[in-house]
C-alpha cells in the first residue's frame, strides 16, 4: 500500500510502521511519525523512528537549499526508483508532498533498461516543463553510467541525490 494512503487513514495509530519487526506502541514517541528500515546498503538493517515533524523540517531545509540554487521546489518533478520502506525511498515522496509538487515512482526494473526508462519517463505528464529531481543509490547509478541513453537521461536532471552507500572510487 502507498504510504500516502496509510498516512491519511483516520483512527489508526499515529505511527506508520514500514519496518519489521514492528516497534511496540509503548516505545513510540508522542505525535505522528514513521517507523522505517535503514542501513540495508551496508548490511546492518536497523529501524528508525522518524517523527513527522522531523521529516517536515528536513523537507523544508531541502526546499530552502533548492531555492538558494535557483530552483523552486513547487515547480519540480521528483522521480524515485527507491522503495518506500527505506528512508531513501520515503524522503523523495515526503519532500514532494510537503512542496506540493508531483512525485513519480519508478519501477526498479526500469533502472536496468535505459531505453525503456527513457520511454517511460518521456510519457509522464509532468516530464516536460518541470525541473527534474532524482534520488538513487550508487548501485543504480553505476548501472546507468556508460550507457549513452541512460547518461543522456541523467543529464536531464537538475539535482541527483545519491545515498545509501559510498560511491565507488
PLM regions with names:
Residues 1-26, 160:
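ANL superfamily adenylate-forming
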Residues 20-37, 71-77:
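Conserved pre-ATP/AMP-binding loop-to-beta segment of ANL
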Residues 33-60:
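Conserved AMP-binding A3 loop
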Residues 38-41, 78, 93, 134, ...:
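Conserved S/T- and glycine-rich ATP-binding loop of Class I adenylate-forming
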Residues 56, 85, 141-142:
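Nucleotide phosphate-binding site architecture
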Residues 60-75, 85-130:
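Conserved AMP-binding/adenylation subdomain of ANL enzymes
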Residues 108-116, 121, 127-169:
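Adenylate-forming
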